[in-house]
């Protein structure tokens, strides 16, 4: 028997075509592996059956929802990770988990080749292949969409010619990737930067004006940086994301229209929906404002940005990322408490904070009676703090 190919299967156009194409062009058997990351939509059994209908000799579905939430979404929260200060890494954090399960499937099903359906213009090819190189450098990688220059038109034509069951047309050519952390939409008319997104682009969020008269106030509780409660009710990491997806999505929260710098050197336009992610990152960052010491908070802003860049760039398994996470774990020792937020009209507004670990001292901060701040010490502090600037200015005026 020829060596099997283990394919990362999404159920979409490119990977459905890839099953049939790999079988016809290489003569190898294909094992399709679909990972349930809480993407919703089609039943995963339907996806599994489609893989078999497309020619896979085996089709495996892995329920990785809790693993994804706890091992991949949670670190994104702890690092307040927003690539280019906007994108909460919806697709980027899912790829290393998919890689992990593909490697496991390759060992279990006798596969020496792993395959993905990424193009040569995107970031995901890097995320997959750097991940494979990190976890299983002995595996060969096959990338038919990239290496054989498939276009969407060619893929659609191949699907039609070979009766591949996939719901995509030239009239509706969106490329969509989604999981419980969010949803990404690209291509089609969105490639023209002046074109506004139409209603059919969105799925996770309502129009921000729909529930204009009914804002939603929510309290998110944290322990050592991890979300543990919603409105006082204990939740798992997955439950926290799912509930906030529903509630924030109903308020139109989490819609992002982004032109981002891809790893491959081009700019691309993406429409993201990440209601739960944006609420959790906002709440966590606010709690850090209350509980982290000033110099630590300042430095962590730099590491947060670097962590997001590493993950976006496909370096999930890099030594630097591992080292940064050890640092971040230390920073979270006192990040416990509750943040109250109002979700309304597409916006998130923090309006309350409480924590037993708070560094906010009311008696030092108040301007009313009971003020314990020794203002007499301020004059000397100001003199010393500004001395270098004073000396520099005096020199420059000479």
UniProtKB/Swiss-Prot annotation:
Gene Ontology process terms (BP): argininosuccinate metabolic process; L-arginine biosynthetic process; urea cycle
One Gene Ontology CC term in the entry: cytoplasm
Pathway(s) the chain acts in: Amino-acid biosynthesis; L-arginine biosynthesis; L-arginine from L-ornithine and carbamoyl phosphate: step 2/3
Protein residues bound to ATP: 8-16, 117
Binding site for L-aspartate: 119, 123-124
Listed EC numbers: 6.3.4.5
Chain positions recorded as L-citrulline binding sites: 87, 123, 127, 175, 260, 272
GO molecular function, one term: ATP binding
Location of the protein in the cell: Cytoplasm
InterPro entries: Arginosuc_syn_C, Arginosuc_syn_N, Arginosuc_synth, Arginosuc_synth_CS, Arginosuc_synth_type_1_subfam, AS_cat/multimer_dom_body, Rossmann-like_a/b/a_fold
Reactions mediated catalytically: L-citrulline + L-aspartate + ATP = 2-(N(omega)-L-arginino)succinate + AMP + diphosphate + H(+)
One Pfam family here: Arginosuc_synth
UniProt keywords, alphabetically: Amino-acid biosynthesis, Arginine biosynthesis, ATP-binding, Cytoplasm, Ligase, Nucleotide-binding
Family that this chain belongs to: Belongs to the argininosuccinate synthase family. Type 1 subfamily.
Known partners and oligomeric status: Homotetramer.
Protein name per the record: Argininosuccinate synthase
Gene: argG
């Amino acid at each position: 028997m020829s060596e099997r190919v283990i394919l990362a299967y999404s159920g979409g156009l490119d990977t459905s075509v890839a099953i049939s194409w790999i079988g016809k062009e290489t003569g190898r058997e294909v094992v399709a592996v679909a990972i349930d990351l809480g993407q919703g939509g089609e039943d995963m059994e339907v996806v599994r059956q489609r893989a078999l209908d497309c020619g896979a000799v085996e089709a495996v579905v892995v329920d990785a929802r809790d693993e994804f939430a706890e091992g991949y979404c949670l670190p994104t929260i702890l690092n307040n990770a927003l690539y280019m200060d906007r994108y909460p890494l919806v697709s980027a954090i899912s790829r290393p988990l998919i890689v992990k399960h593909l490697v496991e499937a390759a060992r279990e099903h006798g596969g020496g080749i792993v395959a993905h359906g990424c193009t040569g213009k995107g970031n995901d090819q890097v995320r997959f292949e750097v991940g494979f190189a990190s976890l299983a450098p002995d595996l060969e990688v096959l990338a038919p969409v990239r290496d054989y220059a498939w276009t969407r038109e060619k893929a659609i034509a191949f699907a039609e010619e070979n009766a591949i069951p996939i719901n995509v047309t030239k009239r509706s050519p969106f490329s969509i990737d989604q999981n419980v952390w969010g949803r990404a939409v690209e291509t089609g008319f969105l490639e023209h930067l002046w074109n506004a997104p139409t209603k059919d682009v969105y799925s996770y969020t309502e129009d921000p004006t729909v529930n204009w008269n009914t804002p939603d106030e929510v309290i998110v509780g944290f322990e050592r940086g991890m979300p543990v409660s919603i409105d006082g009710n204990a939740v798992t990491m997955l439950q926290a994301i799912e509930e906030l997806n529903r509630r924030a999505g109903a308020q139109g929260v989490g819609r992002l229209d982004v032109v981002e710098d891809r790893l491959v050197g081009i700019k691309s336009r993406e429409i993201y929906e990440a209601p739960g992610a944006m609420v959790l990152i906002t709440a966590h960052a606010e709690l850090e404002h209350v509980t982290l010491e000033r110099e630590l908070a300042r430095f962590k802003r730099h590491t947060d940005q670097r962590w997001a860049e590493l993950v976006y760039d496909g370096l999930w398994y890099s030594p630097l990322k591992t080292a940064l996470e050890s640092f971040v774990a230390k920073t979270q020792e006192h990040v416990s408490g509750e943040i109250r937020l109002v979700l309304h009209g597409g916006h998130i507004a923090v309006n309350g904070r409480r924590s037993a670990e708070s560094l906010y001292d009311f008696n030092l901060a108040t301007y009313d009676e009971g003020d314990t701040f020794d203002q007499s010490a301020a004059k000397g502090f100001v003199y010393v703090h500004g001395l270098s600037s004073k000396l520099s200015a005096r020199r420059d005026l000479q």
